[in-house]
Amino acid sequence: MALWIESNGKPLLYAVGRMAMPLFALIFAFNMAKQPGRAQELAKRQWKWAIITQPFFAFAFYDHQPWYALNILLVFAVCSQLVAWIYPRTQYCWIKSILLIAIFAWPLSLASYGLAGIAFVLISVLMLASIAPDKVVLLLWVLSLISLNAASLMTAPIIEVIAFGIIPTLFLPLFMLTLTDSAKATGKRFLPRQTFYWLYCGHLMVLGIVSALLRTWGI
């Protein structure tokens, strides 16, 4: 979503887009960190919704991304599967994990942050799983958050990257950390079950319709 907005020259909308992935990742990481023992069950749900979402994603990004570009839910599916394998130290967990990352890293990099996104989500899970994360984990989290803008750093002026990439990417997620801390204290879910999936599919459908209308009108 963010790359599409950026390519159409709308930096303010692009800035909003940059907030979305870290926000979704923190919500996912918060729920995953609360119940690592259910990681395989959660992974199955992520794979299911990632597959359901892919047609909506292809519709929204028609003419903007190649057909093999993958939606962001597959980042979460990969990460939840990695947690499911590594947390209980299943047999051959590291070999399976490396193969899984190798398979999905490139198609996810086209529109869904690729390795940077996977690293950010996993470090977010590690950070939120701890009552008091140490400074190294916090530093890794901030660095992984900033790395989500690595592609922009290659092509855009540094001032624009800071104003429309790094600051928005940091602002909302850091604000959300305060909310997740309060939710963690009460033991409640941050959002009702499966709300995120419906919202994500819905927003892709809206983007696809808007894009189709713009193509029809020649805009």
Task: Describe each model-derived feature in a short phrase.
Residues 1-219:
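Alpha-helical transmembrane segments and their immediate juxtamembrane cytosolic regions
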